């Protein structure tokens, strides 16, 4: 019995230590993530690395779990160069290892929605289905807003997960929308929200511009 108690105590301590390591890694990723402007164009990501990253990204939250983001992952060099041109000549897409274009599917709410809660009860599935209809049917503004919110959540997941993997990233919104849409064959019921380049920095990011003081941006209970 004494031996079992010792083993149990050691197991608990290991769990606590593991949790602290994860917590510290998360804090470090947040603090060290920067928008990289110059990427090492010789660095390549393996297909397994891309898959591992995207498996984390699809755990990002979405309203009603409708998973209304769609991701275009680009490693093909000629296509990356086309994207750089659409990005007004910026070098990040062509030099980075991976370009992820985050798009929103504005019709996800009605595309077999029961599957979004396939592991739940029938009652739960029907409840979600009806809630989706109420919120999004005949409301293109809600559809668009929700897609943008979902891609925002996913974008931060991409950047922090990439940092945790020892990679760097750069979010980008400066591009010619119609040109990029043509390159990726964007469906009519989708919109491009942003793109994120992932790779290895060729040079450090410039110093942070400086954050506003907390008391200017954080308010307790109300404005």
Positions of the model-derived regions?
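Short, Lys/Arg-enriched N-terminal segments with co-localized hydrophobic residues
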Residues: 8-23
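Acidic, surface-exposed loops and disordered segments
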Residues: 20-223
């Amino acid at each position: 019995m004494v031996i079992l108690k010792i083993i149990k105590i050691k197991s608990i301590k290991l769990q606590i230590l593991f949790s602290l390591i994860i917590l510290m890694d998360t804090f470090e990723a947040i603090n060290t993530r920067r928008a990289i402007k110059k990427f090492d164009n010789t660095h390549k990501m393996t297909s397994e690395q891309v898959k591992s990253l995207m498996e984390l990204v699809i755990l990002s939250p979405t309203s009603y779990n409708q998973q209304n983001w769609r991701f275009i992952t680009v490693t093909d060099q000629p296509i990356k160069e086309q994207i750089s041109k659409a990005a007004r000549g910026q070098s990040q897409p062509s030099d980075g290892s991976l370009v992820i274009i985050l798009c929103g599917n504005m019709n996800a709410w009605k595309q077999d929605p029961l599957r979004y809660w396939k592991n739940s009860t029938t009652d739960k599935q029907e409840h979600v289905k009806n809630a989706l209809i109420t919120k999004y049917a005949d409301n293109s503004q809600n559809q668009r807003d929700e897609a943008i919110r979902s891609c925002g959540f996913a974008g931060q997941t991409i950047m922090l997960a990439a940092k945790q993997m020892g990679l760097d990233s750069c979010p980008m919104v400066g591009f010619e929308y119609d040109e990029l849409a043509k390159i990726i064959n964007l469906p009519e019921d989708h919109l491009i929200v942003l793109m994120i380049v992932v790779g290895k920095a060729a040079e450090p990011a410039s110093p942070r511009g400086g954050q506003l003081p907390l008391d200017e941006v954080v308010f307790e209970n109300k404005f």
